[in-house]
């Protein structure tokens, strides 16, 4: 069983991720982990925080001599901005006069609901943990999950489909385009089509001028996974349900779509399914079964079917505005503009990277459930045996 947790606050000393259940013997590429963290920081419309942080994964346990040892992996990512918050957010009891309270909750954020739930007089501690800065730790854990998936020839990448009303017209993107996109060192908005990306940039430029924010849509693609991950026999093990929960857990994601789930709801059954064929002479490592389309997004009945798995996340515009909306003062209950905290304008590309991590962790967990193995050797041997079973079906 693969489990992960994160800890840390936005302006605390560091963020921590723990990952339990990774087989022993998995090679860990430090440069790859740091590259994934770098990818999360990119994109036009990010705020000033990204100029401060230089995220690097410091592995504290579970890895020696470049390979996992089967014990829990702990990863630490330091917050450079902590030096500016040490006195206002001390671990021990400090000078309350240096505390920076969030006096008026921001509509759309966790501020008010969190303060009510945990009985805080204001929202500083809610903001610190609810912040999307937490996804840094998720991306670090997701990088290790990706390394495990790569051992069986699979990978997970993302691209941006829409920012505001600007949209990629042809969303059937070849895997090679996503690989090329992930290798770029100059990232604008994470779209494979330069013309569509410029239209998206215009949307961000507009909200930069007006003090607003903008949301959008990203798509995560999981490539070259075998059929048979997940199951239909129990509701809480269905793969599409697990992926939806994983992506929906990301800050500001308000809807999740598997495949063409939204558009097929407006069509008829005869046009919504992916017809099945068979090639007796094929090069697939899995089976000779083929499909004419991928409306299902690679999942049928809660089980992967061997096609690319497609997961879309719909991101609302983030809640912190330079022109704040109406709110109330926590102390007086009188009208007061919502608090402003240094923030981003558009985070759709970064959300896509965080979603990659969540999808990779989910799929790696399903792969471990299917194939088992306390060591990488055992895991891969079981996978190869399953592939042989598929070939002889």
Curated annotation (Swiss-Prot):
Involved pathway(s): Metabolic intermediate biosynthesis; chorismate biosynthesis; chorismate from D-erythrose 4-phosphate and phosphoenolpyruvate: step 7/7
GO cellular component: cytosol
Sequence positions that bind FMN: 129-131, 251-252, 301, 316-320, 342
Position of the signal peptide: none
Record-listed NADP(+) binding positions: 40, 46
Coiled-coil residue windows: none
Reactions it catalyzes: 5-O-(1-carboxyvinyl)-3-phosphoshikimate = chorismate + phosphate
Cofactor-binding details, from the entry: Reduced FMN (FMNH(2)).
This protein's record includes keyword tRNA processing: no
Family annotation (CDD domains): Chorismate_synthase (cd07304)
PANTHER family named in the record: CHORISMATE SYNTHASE (PTHR21085:SF0)
Recorded family membership: Belongs to the chorismate synthase family.
Subunit structure: Homotetramer.
Name listed for the protein in its UniProt record: Chorismate synthase
């Amino acid at each position: 069983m693969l489990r992960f947790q994160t800890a840390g606050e936005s302006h605390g000393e560091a963020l921590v991720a723990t990952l339990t259940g990774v087989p022993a013997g998995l090679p860990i590429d430090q440069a790859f982990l740091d590259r994934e963290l770098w990818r999360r920081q990119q994109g036009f419309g990010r705020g000033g925080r990204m100029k401060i942080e230089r995220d690097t994964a410091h592995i504290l346990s579970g890895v020696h001599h470049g390979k996992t040892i089967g014990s829990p992996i702990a990863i630490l990512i330091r917050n450079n901005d902590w030096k500016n918050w040490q006195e206002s957010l001390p671990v021990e009891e400090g000078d309350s006069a240096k505390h920076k309270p969030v006096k008026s909750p921001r509509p759309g954020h966790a501020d008010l609901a969190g303060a009510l739930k945990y009985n805080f007089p204001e929202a500083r501690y809610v903001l610190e943990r609810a912040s999307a800065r937490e996804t840094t730790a998720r991306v670090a854990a997701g990088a290790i999950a990706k390394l495990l998936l790569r051992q069986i020839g699979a990978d997970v990448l993302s691209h941006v489909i829409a920012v505001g009303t600007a949209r990629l017209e042809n969303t059937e993107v070849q895997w090679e385009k996503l690989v090329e996109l992930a290798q770029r060192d100059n990232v604008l908005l994470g779209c494979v089509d330069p013309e569509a990306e410029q239209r998206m940039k215009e949307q961000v430029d507009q909200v930069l001028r007006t003090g607003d924010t903008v949301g959008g849509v990203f798509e995560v693609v999981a490539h070259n996974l075998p059929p048979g991950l997940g199951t239909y026999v129990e509701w809480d093990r269905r793969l599409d349900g697990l992926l939806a929960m994983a992506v929906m857990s990301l800050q500001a994601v308000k809807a999740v779509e598997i495949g063409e789930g939204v558009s097929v709801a407006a069509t008829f059954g005869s046009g919504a399914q992916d017809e099945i064929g068979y090639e007796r002479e094929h090069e697939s490592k899995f089976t000779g079964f083929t499909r004419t389309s991928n409306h299902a997004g690679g999942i049928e009945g809660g089980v992967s079917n061997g096609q690319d798995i497609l997961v879309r996340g719909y991101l609302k515009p983030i809640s912190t505005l330079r022109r704040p909306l109406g709110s109330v003062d926590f102390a007086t209950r009188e009208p007061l503009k919502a608090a402003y905290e240094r923030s981003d304008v558009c985070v759709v590309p970064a959300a896509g990277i965080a979603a990659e991590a969540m999808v990779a962790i989910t799929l790696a967990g399903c792969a471990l459930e299917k194939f088992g193995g306390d060591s990488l050797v055992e895991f891969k041997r079981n996978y190869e045996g399953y592939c042989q079973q598929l070939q002889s079906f």
